[in-house]
């Protein structure tokens, strides 16, 4: 789960990380009122969407008068903001964040993320913060510093100070940054985050450290422990199909291809998508129905897949361990009739009650293409869309 910048800064403040004063706004008048309350004389008008690259995309602007705030808020609110993370269609801006202007002298980058290879939290920092951090990582990776944190001790003061000094900070600024890093680590752990990123982390002309941006991702499996974070959820920023899928406990992510995939198990789902690509096709989605699929659940899965008008064929790939193949077959038959399926359907089933499931499909009278192996299934579904 993702949250907006202003919500992330609320969290950072709770953990003692310094951030500029700011007020969210949902209309132009609210934006002007927020600027009046903050007092100025310089404000930053920021689009709030769940994507990076807002500055380059024209979603972050400096205002030097209340008239500027009104003009910029009118331009940004409601725009389709296109960044390198939104895709060409962009995302509609439904809310703004009006923030005090900052005394920017030097911008740094810092983030915390779980590194699965080392099974530790990594703190990643750079002396080259700001809008072009992706380019820095690509062209000058030596400017990206990574330290791994011992889960038994957490981020200690000396390790935090080492990171601060390695990105060029010194004296009181390095001490402040080290303190911020430790507070970020506490925030990361206590909120069950999967990513905390500050870009940029600013050092002003007095050497003070302040977070000018905040990006958070949270482990959805841990949200039951954090109702206060769930309250930050903005459904307008999420894919409607993914929201609908979550109502039926379906794991769904829409992709850019034309072959719908319905699979049980995340590992098998990824292997299925890889196999489709191996044989020259492009998956239209990731869809895991899990181990407790019912006929209703499979029907809803078909409906969600087919809302994507780019889907030209569907591949159902089931391994019947906990899930019985006859239950999936019943669901497939019910779904085909319910949605009046008019695209080719390839079904591959292996495992519990496999023969019964195959017989049910064969006796259904529906034009279902059967396959015994993943390679055969992928070959047939790719051929069906060409």
Swiss-Prot record:
InterPro entries according to UniProt: ATP-grasp, ATP-grasp_succ-CoA_synth-type, ATP_grasp_subdomain_1, Succ-CoA_synthase_bsu_CS, SUCC_ACL_C, Succ_CoA_ligase-like_bsu, Succinyl-CoA_synth-like
- Give the enzyme class: ligase
What this protein needs as a cofactor is:
Mg(2+)
Q: In which pathway does it act?
A: Carbohydrate metabolism; tricarboxylic acid cycle; succinate from succinyl-CoA (ligase route): step 1/1
Domain ATP-grasp per the UniProt entry, residue ranges: 9-244
- Protein's UniProt keywords contain Metal-binding: yes
Tell me the keywords, alphabetical order.
Answer: ATP-binding, Ligase, Magnesium, Metal-binding, Nucleotide-binding, Tricarboxylic acid cycle
Which EC number(s) are documented for this chain?
A: 6.2.1.5
Q: Which residues bind substrate?
A: 264, 321-323
Q: Name one GO biological process term.
A: tricarboxylic acid cycle
Where ATP binds, per the record, is at 46, 53-55, 99, 102, 107
- Identify the GO cellular component terms for this protein: cytosol; succinate-CoA ligase complex
The cross-references to Pfam families, in alphabetical order and at most eight, read: ATP-grasp_2, Ligase_CoA
Reactions that this protein is recorded to catalyse: succinate + ATP + CoA = succinyl-CoA + ADP + phosphate; GTP + succinate + CoA = succinyl-CoA + GDP + phosphate
Gene Ontology MF annotations = ATP binding; magnesium ion binding; succinate-CoA ligase (ADP-forming) activity; succinate-CoA ligase (GDP-forming) activity
What the record notes about the co-factor is: Binds 1 Mg(2+) ion per subunit.
Q: Which residues bind Mg(2+)?
A: 199, 213
Q: What family does the Swiss-Prot or TrEMBL record give for this protein?
A: Belongs to the succinate/malate CoA ligase beta subunit family.
Write out the function statement from the record: Succinyl-CoA synthetase functions in the citric acid cycle (TCA), coupling the hydrolysis of succinyl-CoA to the synthesis of either ATP or GTP and thus represents the only step of substrate-level phosphorylation in the TCA. The beta subunit provides nucleotide specificity of the enzyme and binds the substrate succinate, while the binding sites for coenzyme A and phosphate are found in the alpha subunit.
- Classification via NCBIfam families: PRK00696.1, sucCoAbeta
Q: How does it assemble?
A: Heterotetramer of two alpha and two beta subunits.
Record-given protein name: Succinate--CoA ligase [ADP-forming] subunit beta
């Amino acid at each position: 789960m993702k949250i907006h910048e202003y919500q992330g800064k609320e969290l950072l403040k709770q953990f003692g990380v310094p951030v500029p004063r700011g007020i969210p706004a949902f209309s132009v008048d609210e934006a002007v009122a927020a600027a009046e309350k903050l007092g100025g004389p310089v404000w930053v008008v920021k689009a709030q969407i769940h994507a990076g690259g807002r500055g380059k995309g024209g979603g972050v602007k400096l205002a030097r008068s209340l008239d500027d705030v009104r003009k910029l808020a009118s331009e940004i609110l409601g725009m389709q903001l296109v960044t390198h993370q939104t895709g060409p269609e962009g995302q509609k801006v439904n809310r703004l964040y009006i923030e005090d202007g900052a005394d920017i002298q030097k911008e740094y980058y810092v983030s915390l993320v779980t590194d699965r290879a080392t099974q530790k939290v990594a703190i990643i920092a750079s002396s080259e913060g700001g809008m072009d951090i992706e380019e820095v990582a690509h062209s000058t990776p030596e400017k990206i510093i990574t330290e791994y944190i011992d889960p038994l001790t957490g981020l200690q003061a000396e390790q935090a100070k080492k990171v601060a000094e390695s990105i060029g900070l010194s004296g009181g600024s390095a001490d402040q940054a080290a303190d911020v890093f430790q507070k970020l680590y506490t925030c990361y752990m206590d909120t069950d985050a999967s990513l905390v990123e500050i870009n940029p982390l600013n050092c002003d002309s007095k050497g003070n450290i302040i977070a000018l941006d905040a990006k958070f991702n949270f482990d959805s499996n841990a949200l039951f422990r954090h109702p206060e974070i769930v309250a930050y959820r903005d459904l307008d920023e999420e894919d409607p199909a993914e929201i609908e899928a979550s109502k039926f406990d379906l794991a769904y992510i829409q992709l850019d291809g034309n072959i719908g995939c319905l699979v049980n198990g995340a590992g098998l789902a990824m292997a299925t998508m890889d196999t489709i690509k191996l044989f020259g096709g492009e998956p239209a989605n990731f869809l895991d129905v899990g181990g407790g699929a019912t006929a209703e659940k499979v029907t809803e899965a078909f409906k969600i897949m087919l809302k994507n008008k780019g889907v030209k064929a569907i591949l159902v790939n089931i391994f019947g361990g906990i899930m019985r193949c006859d239950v999936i077959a019943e669901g497939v038959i019910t779904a085909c009739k319910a949605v009046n399926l008019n695209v080719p359907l390839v079904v591959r089933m292996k495992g519990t009650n496999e023969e019964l499931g195959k017989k049910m499909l064969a006796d259904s009278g529906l034009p279902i293409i059967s396959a015994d192996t993943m390679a055969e299934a992928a070959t047939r579904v790719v051929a069906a869309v060409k």
